A protein has these predicted regions:
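A generic signature of intrinsically disordered, low-complexity regions enriched in glycine/proline
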Residues: 10-15, 36-39, 46, 63, ...
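Poly-acidic low-complexity segments
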Residues: 11-13, 52, 72
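Short, well-ordered coil/turn elements that cap or connect secondary structure elements
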Residues: 22-24, 50, 84
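C-terminal catalytic/acceptor-binding lobe
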Residues: 111-207
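Acidic donor-binding segment of Leloir-type glycosyltransferases
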Residues: 1-34
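Active-site acidic Asp-centered loop
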Residues: 7, 58-61, 66-67
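Conserved catalytic core of nucleotide-sugar-dependent glycosyltransferases
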Residues: 37-41, 45-48, 63-148
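Short aromatic/hydrophobic "clamp" motif used to bind/position activated sugar donors
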Residues: 55
């Protein structure tokens, strides 16, 4: 089942496109009145219930790689999760080509490079998974139900590891745009409110 959650997009063409996909039965669409970041997914996750053992969550500004040996990225992640029960969340690696020469993203580049130092196994780096598409186990979080809140990356059960697949490398288009850096009101007030409510932190490069 393919589900799209729209967090109060302002682009009318985008909204029309999503409605067209819904009307054709291609996707199930949730449209929120506020951009509350991860909170926006929770109504959808509640409706999914507990029937799924694995849930894939994907950002909309991400380019996916070509199939690896005939397998799409999602099939590769599912297979890796099935054979590695100690991995609770598995994402794609991210190309750094669009930030390596940006001085104002030097700290971000350095941090991302650190995520390719330690291995969980031959296929997976031990790495934080944030802005990349990822596959989650439904019992990943200590609060029981599978729900997402600001700061959820620190709420993993201690016996689960988090990683990025070494061979599946995507491209984060959000880093192409220099407005990713703080040059104006790029983060909506409602999104900031959702972080403040749960004590979530922002990267200094973003706000």
């Amino acid at each position: 089942e393919l589900i799209v959650v729209d967090n109060n997009s302002s682009d009318l063409e985008h909204r029309k496109y999503l409605n067209d996909l819904r009307n054709k039965g291609i996707v199930k669409l949730y449209q929120n009145n506020l951009n509350q970041f991860t909170f926006g997914l929770n109504e959808c996750l509640k409706d999914l219930g507990d029937s799924r053992s694995l849930i894939a969550i994907c950002d909309s500004d991400f380019l996916y790689p070509e199939p690896l040996d005939g397998e799409c990225w999602l099939s590769v992640l599912v297979r890796e999760m099935q054979k590695s029960p100690y991995i609770g969340k598995l994402g794609l690696s991210i190309s750094l080509e669009n930030i390596k020469n940006k001085k104002h993203l030097k700290s971000l580049y350095k941090r991302e490079k650190e995520f390719s130092r330690l291995s969980l196994n031959n296929n997976v780096w031990a790495a934080q998974v944030d802005t990349t598409p990822a596959l989650y186990r439904k019992d990943l979080f200590f609060w029981g139900k599978f729900r997402l809140y600001p700061g959820h990356m620190t709420a993993n059960k201690p016996y689960y590891h988090i990683g990025r697949h070494k061979k599946i490398i995507g491209y984060h288009m959000g880093w192409d745009n220099d407005e990713y850096i703080s040059k104006g009101p790029i983060v909506s007030v409602s999104k900031i409110d959702s972080f403040a409510l749960y004590g979530g932190g922002f990267d200094r490069a973003v706000v």
